[in-house]
Design a protein with these regions (language model features):
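Short, flexible turn/loop "capping" segments at secondary-structure junctions
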Residues: 5, 67, 138-141
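Primarily extracytoplasmic ectodomains and periplasmic/lumenal surface modules that are beta-strand-rich
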Residues: 20-21, 81-83, 154-156
Length: 202
């Protein structure tokens, strides 16, 4: 959680484009359409979507507000299931021994091991609950600026994909070069000169 934390780690974005119709309706519809499912798919390894900042485990944008001053405020929630490798190894060893006893053989084939591993993975995937990670978002639509409160690569990639899908607006992550392109008041020639610079090696 970024907004209520004592320390912040954030990524800055420039949002390219504007809505052609009512802004509030477009944002609300995009959030609702791509909110994280209330009921998780027990076989799905990763699930991601929007949820209200004040209610991250109840993604109801009809009930909870997404307006915070001049900003739209909401959260990206990523639910992920992670099965420890040693847990799979343990259950595989038990299942292999059981298979040997049932077949009367002292070995099993590579294909049989693959089938056993897939079966065990499916069973564990069903049983193990997802672990949620929540990343807050602050979006100033008028200024075309947005803060995502994380710098994790995977979270940023999920955010960029879901944001574009939700609003049909392109989020451009701000680095020195993209700041020159999107935020500076330099002329076209000046921008070209800056973008052609190479890093200095010490």
């Amino acid at each position: 959680m970024g907004l209520i934390s004592s320390t912040h780690s954030m990524s800055r974005y420039h949002i390219e484009g504007k809505f052609e119709t009512a802004v509030m309706d477009e944002v609300r519809n995009g959030l609702i359409k791509n909110s994280i499912p209330k009921l998780e798919n027990v076989y799905e390894e990763i699930s991601a979507g929007w949820t209200p900042c004040e209610s991250p485990y109840n993604p109801d944008f009809e009930k909870f507000s997404f307006i915070f001053g001049n900003y739209f405020s909401f959260s990206l929630r990523i639910d992920k299931k992670s099965i420890p490798a040693k847990l799979i190894q343990k259950h595989m060893a038990l299942e292999i021994e059981k298979k040997k006893e049932e077949s009367g053989r002292d070995f099993i084939s590579k294909n049989e091991k693959t089938e056993i591993k897939e079966k065990i993975t499916d069973i564990l995937m069903y049983k193990i609950p997802s672990i949620p990670s929540i990343y807050d978002v602050l979006w100033n639509y008028e200024e075309g600026s947005l803060f995502l409160f994380t710098t994790q690569k995977a979270a940023n990639e999920f955010f960029e994909t879901i944001f574009l899908k939700s609003f049909d607006l392109k989020p451009i992550r701000l680095f020195p070069y993209t700041i020159v392109e999107t935020k500076s008041k330099l002329s076209a020639d000046q921008k070209e000169n800056v973008l052609s610079l190479s890093p200095l090696k010490y």
